[in-house]
């Protein structure tokens, strides 16, 4: 996927400020702004992207987008080559390197960005209120550029196997967001100690089940 504009932590903050988060409750908006701020010592683009994905699902669960029954045609493009992203995850201990707090999360970012972008753009004419959350996801899909993309056939195969197993030809928007997150969680590495492992599924479940303020 061609990404038109390079984004750094220096200008991500202003871009986020220009993307109004009107349909999120204040606590969700504050959470997004906190993680998507320009504090590059704590959070990555990937974590910013995941925060918007998970909070969008939370808003679906709260029926705030008025589209709980909306379904979309699955337009996953399985011909895309496989790539993975190496993104530093702070506070994760690498068991092979003493006193190291920086493990790596590997995920199929290129495919996920491409698929999500196509869902948001190609389905837009059929959406009514359901288009509201997609502008944030589309926004981040185009902006996560500060990553290291490396070809990996194993990552591509695991991604396609996951899609073939779990995704039907027509799915709800909520399920698409969920499966996007779990698809991103498939290839984790390198091996970290259990205490410091960044578990994407645990993170998503925590965000989706937390008490509302």
UniProtKB/Swiss-Prot annotation:
This is Protein ORF D.
